[in-house]
């Protein structure tokens, strides 16, 4: 038979539970206060603080790994490449190319010309000093050019240079076709727009709502919706 607790024992248990609840409330209050202080401190930090922190940590780790590789007499760049998959390496290379010569779409003809110029300059081969000195010796004073200098028939392009020019022109033509592709207008299609901007807007609406409005549109065309 279970022993009946006395009033003093019951009171002691209640006090113990109240004390435990009080401790938990104090702990929760302390935790909440610390979280509020931490959140306020985070709000006062710059917007890009987390990114800068991650970058600083990455730089420290990279410097440490580089120093360890040098101490062991190993090529750090080669070790890094061994840890990168072919897919990631290709993605990094493409990202680097986009950063060096980004394609932001057409803005002005001057910007497009400057972008093409930078791309062509970067694709130029390394300078051949021997060829430079040889041409300088062959052409003499005409090498630097002047108001009355004529180099016609005195210079000859190599087959490799000609092939490179042809290849580059073909690539430019292909890129121009891709960026300047015009969509053929269908004469039999319904005309539900008043200009090009309105046509694009209607196409966006069709992508989202055509399945819901197809029946209503058909009824309106047949005149059965009245």
Curated annotation (Swiss-Prot):
GO terms for biological process: mRNA splicing, via spliceosome. It is found in: Nucleus. GO terms for cellular component: catalytic step 2 spliceosome; post-mRNA release spliceosomal complex; precatalytic spliceosome; Prp19 complex; U2-type catalytic step 2 spliceosome. Pfam families: SYF2 (PF08231). Residues 1-29 form a coiled coil. Its main location: nucleus. Keywords: Coiled coil, mRNA processing, mRNA splicing, Nucleus, Spliceosome. One of its GO terms (molecular function) is RNA binding. InterPro entries: mRNA_splic_SYF2. It comes from the Eukaryota. Identified in the spliceosome C complex. Involved in pre-mRNA splicing as component of the spliceosome. Belongs to the SYF2 family. This is Pre-mRNA-splicing factor Syf2. It comes from Drosophila melanogaster. The lineage of its organism: Eukaryota, Metazoa, Ecdysozoa, Arthropoda, Hexapoda.
